[in-house]
Every structure is written in structure tokens, then in C-alpha cells.
Regions:
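Low-complexity, intrinsically disordered short peptide segments enriched in small/polar/basic residues
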Residues: 13, 241-242
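Class II aminoacyl-tRNA synthetase-like tRNA-binding/catalytic domains
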Residues: 2-234
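Conserved small/polar residues in nucleotide/adenosyl-binding loops
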Residues: 235-241
Length: 245
């Protein structure tokens, strides 16, 4: 196992000349004879790594056998790219890593669609292989954006003296705008819990109890026909205040 010293998205000109270790998936591979260029990918970005047959024959011979989505670890030295090879579209576009040692963790079978291009397959096909689709750059950016938004909400609300309270996910069925999703009780035979359409009941309990500023980012569920603006489950931000002034 090669313990990484950096991620695939953080190397730049300040690292030139340094020995570094990376782990990741093979995103692209180009064999130019005595040189093999590979785009190594992890959650943080991509780094182009280079295998030179003349300088490191063993690593080069291993690289010739690699396929897309193989998982590898490498040791190498950061070098500057020629001016005409700089890629300004990625954070690591000014450098390469010349590999002197490689360890193959896992070899991949051919993937059912091109992970570098989500549009290469229909949605149903991608969903069947969701664990592969989640490797795509677009979806990973969506997850990062969602994380940043929820963190910003939490920081903003906390700075304004709101506290975050997590309310129960199983509750008594209460009439609202849609049907409830029901969950049978194992202990109380013939009785059911309901998944909340909103945390309304618990909001009112908290307000009456004196929690005049609370917020919650919670999952809500509505058993109704699925539409683009009416998913059966969605994330809800609620921020009731007992007193405005």
C-alpha cells in the first residue's frame, strides 16, 4: 500500500522537484511509444502522470498492461510541463508526475459506459450502475456543492442564534396534503408509524417548549405521483421563530 502524500487535485508549480505519492483511478491513458501518459483521478481532481521507458523500465512495463478504471498507487517526482502542454482547465495543468514506482491495487473489467462522458449512456443504464455514475465529475461536483450549501446554512443560522434540532423520522400519521408512507410496527401488531411529510408537529412542540429560534435540514416524504416538482422524498429547510423581534 502506498500512502498518499497529496490528492490528485492539489499539485502545482510549488511542488516541482518534490517526491510525492498518489492513489486513484485511471481516467485516460495514452501510449506514445517510449512514454505513457495517464490521467489519474480521485474525488479531488486529476493529475497527469508519466511513465518513461528509458528512466523507469519496470514501472513503464506495468503501465502498458493497465486499463481504464484500474486502481493504482504511484510514487514519483513532480516536473513542470512544457509551455505548449499546459492545461489551464484543471488545477494541476502546469505539472506532470514522472513515475518511478507503481502498485496496482485492483484491475477493472470494461465499464458499461464511458465514465468520462455521462451522455454516452441512457439514464436507466447509468442508474443500473449508479456506483460508477457517482464517479463522474458532474455528479461529484453536485455533492460538493450540496455540502457547501448546507454548511453555509448551518453557519448562517448558528451565527443568528438559531440552534439545529433533529426531530424523529417515525411519527404518528397526521393528515396533510398527500398520503403518508406507512411503516409497520414490529412490537405493536397492526399499528403503523408514518414517515413525516413535514416536521410540523415537532416544530410546534419546540416553539411551545421555549425554543424560539430553531432550524432543521430534514428529509420529508409524500406518497404521491412522482413529478419533476413533486419528488416522493425531498430535503426540507425549516426555520420557525417564536418571536420576530
Amino acid at each position: 500500500m502506498i500512502k498518499r502524500t497529496h490528492t490528485c487535485g492539489e499539485l502545482n508549480k510549488s511542488n516541482i522537484g518534490h517526491e510525492i505519492h498518489l492513489n486513484g483511478w485511471i481516467s485516460k491513458s495514452r501510449d506514445l511509444g517510449g512514454l505513457i501518459f495517464i490521467d489519474l483521478r480521485d474525488r479531488y481532481g486529476k493529475t497527469q502522470i508519466v511513465f518513461n521507458e528509458e528512466n523507469h523500465t519496470n514501472a513503464f512495463n506495468t503501465a502498458k498492461k493497465l486499463g481504464l478504471e484500474d486502481v493504482i498507487g504511484i510514487k514519483g517526482v513532480v516536473v513542470a510541463r512544457p509551455e505548449d502542454a499546459i492545461n489551464k482547465d484543471i488545477a494541476t495543468g502546469e505539472i506532470d508526475v514522472e513515475v518511478n514506482e507503481i502498485l496496482v491495487y485492483n484491475e477493472s473489467e470494461p465499464t458499461p459506459f464511458d465514465i468520462n462522458d455521462r451522455n454516452s449512456a441512457m439514464e436507466d443504464h447509468r442508474l443500473r450502475y449508479r456506483y460508477l455514475e457517482l464517479r463522474t465529475e458532474d455528479l461529484q461536483k453536485n455533492f460538493v456543492l450540496r455540502h457547501k450549501v448546507t454548511q453555509a446554512v448551518r453557519e448562517y443560522m448558528s451565527d443568528d442564534d438559531f440552534i439545529e434540532v433533529e426531530t424523529p423520522i417515525l411519527m404518528k400519521s397526521t393528515p396533510e396534503g398527500a398520503r403518508d408512507f406507512l411503516v409497520p410496527s414490529r412490537i405493536h401488531q397492526g399499528r403503523f408509524y408514518a414517515l413525516p411529510q413535514s416536521p410540523q408537529t415537532y416544530k410546534q412542540l419546540l416553539m411551545v417548549s421555549g425554543f424560539d429560534r430553531y432550524f432543521q435540514i430534514c428529509k420529508c416524504f409524500r406518497d404521491e405521483d412522482f413529478r419533476a416538482d413533486r419528488p416522493v422524498s425531498y430535503t426540507h429547510l425549516t426555520l420557525p421563530t417564536k418571536r420576530i423581534v
